[in-house]
Design a protein with these regions (language model features):
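Conserved NTP-binding catalytic cores of kinases and kinase-like/nucleotidyltransferase enzymes
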Residues: 1-89
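ATP-binding pocket architecture of kinase catalytic cores
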Residues: 8, 51-58, 66-163
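Short, flexible loop/turn elements at secondary-structure junctions
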Residues: 12, 47, 64, 71-73, ...
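Short, solvent-exposed loop/turn and secondary-structure capping segments
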Residues: 19-20, 44, 125-128, 218-219, ...
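Soluble non-cytosolic domains of exported or imported proteins
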Residues: 74-82, 161-169, 194, 268-272, ...
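Catalytic-loop signature of eukaryotic-like protein kinases
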Residues: 102, 211, 216-224
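ATP-dependent phospho-/nucleotidyl transfer catalytic cores
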Residues: 121-208, 284
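Middle-to-C-terminal accessory/interaction subdomains
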Residues: 179-210, 224-234, 238-348
């Protein structure tokens, strides 16, 4: 079945403005044609070091929605983000929906892209989740460390997407308080301000998929609108399932079972939370994190995009590497399962 094609047209002067500064976050006007409909949009480049790549990623905004068109340039399979978000959804951690597509800009075929749903207000409305604030972890300062002695703000590393100054102050205070409180007082504080079940499930997802960068950045933190606890949503899971964020093959044990960042450390310092985390991991090893469960999903995604990837003028990997990626992911799952089984005792 052919992938959907999104055709974007940008006026020459606007396109020149876009290309003149790849680091600018300024949007330029454009038109998007999909399914016979022409929609006015705004478009800009997105990403970090990937902006320097020949195949760039884009953020597109309509009057109502925001979409991320990821080039997946460093992932030879082009499916790791999609596979990861589907995995998170299967373990009941709300995650962006995705769809592979072909992007065409001013009649030039840019290749296969992954259209990723933005984690903004419509994301929560669609899922019936009341939300008070939405906060992106945008760099590795978002590691929940005590920053008071460094002179950095406790909000360093974060970007407030929805909310007010009060929400900025609240998160800063949360980061400070987890370092000021100890013992039973800390445990009570965490239970009051953090959805620990959600956090442990998110931790399982990050640890099982092997996303080394997902603990100190590349996540969304949101405050639930009713119970006022913080919850986690994954973001940018290209460096997973046996490869890092640059596409390099890595050992399956790159990410330790205890995960990383100071909040994880604080949570797992309490035995009841370790026991729950261990039970969740054990359950996922028996159910969703298996070759039997994941490989059909891998092959379905891989087969759906294969013909288009072979024609992608900007795919930097050979067809041979692309064709071997399902087996690379299979080997990772087998090895990662053994890693986790060997380390479960560390959670006692």
């Amino acid at each position: 079945m052919p992938l959907p094609v999104y055709r974007i047209t940008i006026k020459d002067k606007d396109y020149e403005q876009l290309k003149s500064n790849i680091w600018s976050n300024h949007f330029v006007p454009a038109q998007l044609v999909s399914g016979g409909k022409r929609i006015p949009i705004r478009i800009r480049y997105r990403g970090g070091h990937t902006r320097e790549y020949p195949k760039k990623s884009y953020e597109i905004r309509t009057s109502k929605y925001t979409y991320h068109f990821n080039a997946e340039y460093d992932d030879p399979s082009l499916i790791r983000n999609a596979l990861s978000f589907q995995f998170f959804n299967s373990i009941h951690v709300p995650s962006p929906s995705t769809r592979h597509c072909v992007l065409n800009l001013n009649n030039e075929n840019l290749g296969v892209y992954l259209n990723i749903e933005a984690v903004k207000t419509p994301f929560f409305r669609k899922r019936g989740i009341p939300v008070r604030s939405i906060i992106y972890a945008v760099n590795d300062n978002a590691d929940f460390t005590d920053k008071r002695s460094s002179g950095k703000s406790s909000f360093s590393g974060y970007n407030l997407i929805k909310g007010s100054e009060r929400d900025r102050v609240k998160l800063s205070n949360f980061v400070q308080q987890i370092h000021l409180k100890v013992g039973a007082e800390l445990q009570q504080y965490l239970r009051k301000h953090l959805d620990i079940e959600n956090y442990l499930r998110w931790l399982c997802g990050a640890v099982l998929t092997g996303n080394y960068d997902g603990f100190n950045q590349n996540y969304t933190l949101f405050e639930h609108g009713k119970n006022r606890t913080y919850r986690m949503i994954p973001w940018d899971y290209e460096g997973t399932w046996g490869r890092n964020c640059y596409g390099k093959l890595v050992d399956s044990d790159l990410v330790k079972i205890q995960g990383y960042n100071k909040l994880t450390e604080k949570i797992l310092s309490f035995r009841p939370h370790r026991q729950r985390y261990k039970a969740l991991l054990s359950g996922f090893l028996e159910s969703v994190f298996t070759v039997r469960r994941q490989l059909p999903i891998v092959y379905k995604m891989h087969n759906a995009i294969a013909d288009h990837v072979y024609k992608d003028p900007n795919h930097k990997w050979s067809d041979k590497v692309f064709d071997s990626e399902p087996d690379t992911i299979r080997k990772y799952i087998d090895q990662r399962r053994q890693d986790i089984l060997n380390q479960l005792g560390n959670l006692d």
